[in-house]
């Protein structure tokens, strides 16, 4: 008999649409009722001035010694932009990446990247290879806006740091309607909500400003930063995964669903 430890549990996944597939399959294989409500969309920057800056930075890559990819989205958008310009990644650049998915994506495209076990800026900054960077030029690939810890610390270590911002993180237009409908279907039952970033948490608050049925929802979040943000936002039921990978989120959900946990049916 197939073991289904998540039978009777409802789990909502909120990543951009095509990025949910693997986790959805894993959750369903363990018996969960999975609902996909993307609360994040990745939209490439397309304003003329933004495109001109990206174009200039990508053509000047030969001048960089270091490159950092903040996420898989950053890696995907960068390689897509380079392909559109018929550019090839320079072999001399030392590449760093946050997250195993980012590293795997780059590897699949022939780019070897160093990634910290602690999948955040602090973990990256602790790597031995980034301690002595004086005089080196580092380009950080990311979305519009974000944390400044990485660039600030590398500049304190006398590196020259620039951002190549290729996309914006948006709330999908249909998200609020999907969320409202799902809440009406939920009624008095409970559910687990996978919130993979602070940006996604903000979007959850945007689609549900009245915090409907908040007591019925348990957030599954990666790491202490998102945990603190969720607590500050008023969520009382939070479980914390080691990171945002599918395996870490699934492991945390499965532990929560163990016999000592609360059944969600």
Q: Predicted regions: what is each one?
A:
Residues 1-265:
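Signature of uroporphyrinogen-III synthase
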């Amino acid at each position: 008999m197939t073991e289904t430890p998540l039978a009777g549990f409802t789990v909502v996944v909120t990543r951009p649409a095509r990025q949910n597939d693997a986790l959805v399959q894993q959750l369903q294989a363990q018996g969960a009722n999975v609902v996909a409500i993307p609360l994040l969309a990745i939209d490439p920057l397309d304003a003329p001035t933004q495109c001109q800056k990206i174009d200039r930075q990508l053509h000047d890559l030969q001048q960089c010694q270091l490159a950092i990819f903040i996420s898989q989205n950053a890696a995907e958008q960068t390689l897509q932009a380079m392909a559109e310009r018929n550019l090839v990644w320079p072999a001399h650049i030392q590449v760093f990446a946050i997250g195993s998915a980012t590293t795997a994506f780059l590897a699949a495209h022939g780019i070897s990247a160093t990634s910290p076990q602690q999948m955040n800026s602090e973990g990256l900054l602790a790597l031995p290879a980034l301690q002595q960077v004086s005089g080196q030029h580092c380009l950080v690939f990311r979305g519009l806006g974000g944390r400044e810890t990485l660039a600030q610390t590398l500049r304190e270590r006398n590196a020259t740091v620039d951002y190549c911002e290729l996309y914006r993180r948006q709330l999908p237009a249909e998200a609020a309607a999907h969320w409202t409908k799902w809440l009406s279907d939920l009624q008095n039952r409970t559910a687990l909500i996978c919130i993979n970033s602070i940006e996604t948490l903000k979007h959850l608050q945007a689609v549900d400003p009245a915090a409907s049925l908040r007591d019925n929802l348990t957030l599954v979040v990666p790491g202490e930063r998102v945990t603190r943000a969720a607590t500050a936002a008023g969520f009382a039921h939070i479980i914390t995964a080691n990171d945002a990978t599918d395996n870490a989120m699934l492991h945390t959900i499965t532990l929560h669903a163990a016999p000592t946990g609360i059944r969600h049916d």
